């Protein structure tokens, strides 16, 4: 079996893949270890042009090579901070109101994709399969094809794919979807995402969609599929139990003084519905005086993308809301919302989940939401907490034992909290068992192995006449900044 080449915007470090990172890194690393291969992408460093062009830096861990490159300031601003996170991220999360479009940022996005492709080509072998991840890399396969690469190339979109009416707000939407069609297999988190893509293909690209997700568009044939990302639930359960008596859990327990605990953990992102969540919790305190002083919401939300301006606003909004609600309902010995702006080790989070009575996960839009799955997996089967989950998380389709809410309905969310806080143990157990069965049926290994099986089954493209893997004509046509000059136009 050929090697696996994983490409993602950020590459986990070899240490992170051994457990401290999210499940994705662990899952992908598992596949890399099986076949041997390369994990290629940005190191997370902003560097000089000389250093960037000298890369990639290679680090070996058994049969796996971690290959990373630095980005120049301009690349970072245009590709990462600009088009990826100020255009694609908001639009793909249905927040056109927060999106901007700048031609030079889009040009930078394409330039960096072409440059990354050029760097990767030198590491490729003929029977490798390539698996690219997420919205930073929509044009990556097209850039590899321009370098003469004929290997199988797959893509998995971790975030929602928006309906065409939303997507067409991005001026070069057609060029982006055309680029996406250079992949051999596109994986989505949910049926809704896949349908939205098919809808675009049929109505805007005049392509065809056949049963089995077979798509023909822009002169290309490709496949699409739904692959719901999961977790390893039994490993999480074991981890949560193992650490349940550690000091941090004891400290939290003691400070709660018998109060019920609602736990929320997210990256600080406007897609996660944090302000709406705080307001729903406020509704609970307002409508149910018996819970005042008797329930605490712990919100853990470390800042991300802090140099993108919309992320500064969400931080301010949230601090304001937490302060306002706490001002209204705090007592000398009671703070209703504990809002923590920091990252926690994974094992700590899992043991805190186990200690809580409610997991409150209410994104406005989310590809899957692994926190919801982790929360369920971390529960004590004898006395499980209840998951209150947004209908707009991909996970809602599988976790049917949860209380499903609409995050725009603060009273509805408040009622779900009331119900969860007083739910009898036999109902909690029944709901937990349903959710746990879904997690076990479709764990992270199933996601990864099914996707890779389907990618390996894609018919291979005919090899280029010179048998090139980037050593042929495509790779030699270079502009000054290192991007192939046959990369698509900037806008
Ligand atoms: P994210 O938007 O990052 O992922 P999510 O799926 O919830 O969202 O994954 C977050 C991961 O980070 C979880 O494993 C969680 O435990 C961890 N995490 C969150 N807050 C943390 C904290 N304070 N400290 C430490 N760890 C923390 C994107 C998409 C999702 C999709 C995933 C995977 O937006 O929709 O589910 O990719 O495909």
Where does each model-flagged region fall?
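Catalytic cores of carbohydrate-active enzymes across secretory and cytosolic contexts
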Residues: 1-491
């Amino acid at each position: 079996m050929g090697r696996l080449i994983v490409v993602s915007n950020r590459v986990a470090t070899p240490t992170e893949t051994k457990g401290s990172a999210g499940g994705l890194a662990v899952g992908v690393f598992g596949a890399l270890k099986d076949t041997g291969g390369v994990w290629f992408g940005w190191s997370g460093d902003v560097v000089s042009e000389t250093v960037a062009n000298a890369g990639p830096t290679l680090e070996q861990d058994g049969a796996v090579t971690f290959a990373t490159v630095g980005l120049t300031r301009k690349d970072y601003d245009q590709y990462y901070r600009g088009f990826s996170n100020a255009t694609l991220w908001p639009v793909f999360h249905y927040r056109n109101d927060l999106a901007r479009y700048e031609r030079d940022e889009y040009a930078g996005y394409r330039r960096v994709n072409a440059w990354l492709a050029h760097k990767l080509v030198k590491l490729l072998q003929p029977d490798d399969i390539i698996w690219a991840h997420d919205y930073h890399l929509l044009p990556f396969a097209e850039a590899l094809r321009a370098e003469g690469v004929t290997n199988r190339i797959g893509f998995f979109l971790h975030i929602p794919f928006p309906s065409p009416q939303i997507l067409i707000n991005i001026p070069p939407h057609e060029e982006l979807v055309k680029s996406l069609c250079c992949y051999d297999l596109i994986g989505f988190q949910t049926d809704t995402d896949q349908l939205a893509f098919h809808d675009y293909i049929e109505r805007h690209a005049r392509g065809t969609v056949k049963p089995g997700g077979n798509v023909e568009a822009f002169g290309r044939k490709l496949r699409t599929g739904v692959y719901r990302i999961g977790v390893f639930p039994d490993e999480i359960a074991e981890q949560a139990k193992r650490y349940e008596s550690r000091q941090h859990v004891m400290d939290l327990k003691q400070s709660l003084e018998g109060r019920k605990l609602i736990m929320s953990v997210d990256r600080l992102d406007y897609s996660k519905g944090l302000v709406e969540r705080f307001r729903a919790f406020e509704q609970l305190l307002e409508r149910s005086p018996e819970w005042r002083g008797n329930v605490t919401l712990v919100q853990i939300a470390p800042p991300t993308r802090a140099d993108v301006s919309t992320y500064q606003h969400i931080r301010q909004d949230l601090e304001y809301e937490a302060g306002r609600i706490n001002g209204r309902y705090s007592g000398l010995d009671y703070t209703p919302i504990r809002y923590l702006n920091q990252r926690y080790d994974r094992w700590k989070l899992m043991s805190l989940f186990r200690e809580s009575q409610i997991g409150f996960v209410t994104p406005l839009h989310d590809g899957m939401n692994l926190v919801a799955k982790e929360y369920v997996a971390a529960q004590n089967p004898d006395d499980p907490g209840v998951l209150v989950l947004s209908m707009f998380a991909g996970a809602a389709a599988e976790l049917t034992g949860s209380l499903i809410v609409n995050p725009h309905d603060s009273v509805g969310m408040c009622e779900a909290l009331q119900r969860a806080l007083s739910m009898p143990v036999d109902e909690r157990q029944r709901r937990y068992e349903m959710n746990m069965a879904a997690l076990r049926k479709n764990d992270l290994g199933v996601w990864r192995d099914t996707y890779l099986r389907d990618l390996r089954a894609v018919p291979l493209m005919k090899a280029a006449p010179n048998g090139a893997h980037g050593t042929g004509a495509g790779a030699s046509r270079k502009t000054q900044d290192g991007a192939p000059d046959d990369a698509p136009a900037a806008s």
